[in-house]
Amino acid sequence: ITEGQHLFQVRDLKEYFADIDSALAQMHADGIDTIALMGHSTGGLISAYYLSENPDSPVKALLLNSPFLDWNFNGFMRKVAIPAFGALGRLFPDLAISQGDGTGYQESLLKKHHGEWNYNQDWKLFHPQKVDASWTRAISSAQNKIKKGAGIRVPILLMHSDKSVDGDHWTPEFQHADAVLNVKDISRIGRKLGQDVTEDTIRGGLHDLVLSSPPVREQVYNYIFSWLRQKHIF
């Protein structure tokens, strides 16, 4: 993120495909021909969307860490509000939409609160920032296309926590659950992304599984490398 750039300003998630293409081209130039693509949350949605739209990609496997495959809202929000925001995103792409003011997940990560990590909070914000209506539209569009049939050809490792936790304010449960997405949605949609999907449910995992407590993230990495060996990726 550089000066002048605006967070959550995107019209179509395909805008990110060029970044993936550039990375793949550079790896090919470096003589790397065995590539596994990994994505977390929105990055997981983008990664799945990319492989759905680019079936001839050189990527050999897809690893998904709590992918953002659906909105974690109630029925009214999903069926009425989100489509309405999407329509507004076409007409008023820069319209600002609140994400609320909850900081429970951030507190579960940061060392100065209840976590064990220090990171650049200009990049990973502590207080949720408003998003553009166009961003909401772009997310929904990609999710809907994925739900209709992603048809991803490569093996997929789908990972998520065993439970979700709701609320704006931190409680001890935030240290052992996904505080961002509904893990049932991840499972329901993720299992249909392709013909070869391995689902691993991580007991006590956070939304970003590799930022979970040491015993949990050790389990995550063991799953990843075991699966890669099993699929003869590396």
List the model feature ranges, each with a label.
Residues 162-201:
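Conserved loop-alpha-helix segment in the C-terminal half of the alpha/beta-hydrolase fold
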Residues 152, 158-160:
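Short beta-strand/loop motif that positions the catalytic acidic residue
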Residues 8-28:
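Alpha/beta-hydrolase active-site loop
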Residues 196-234:
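Catalytic active-site module of serine/aspartate enzymes centered on a nucleophile-bearing elbow/loop
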Residues 127-148:
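Active-site nucleophile elbow and catalytic-triad environment of alpha/beta-hydrolase enzymes
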Residues 30-41:
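Alpha/beta-hydrolase fold nucleophile elbow
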Residues 42, 46-131:
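Alpha/beta-hydrolase-fold enzymes
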Residues 1-10, 207:
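Glycine-rich "HGGG/HGxG" loop immediately N-terminal to the catalytic nucleophile
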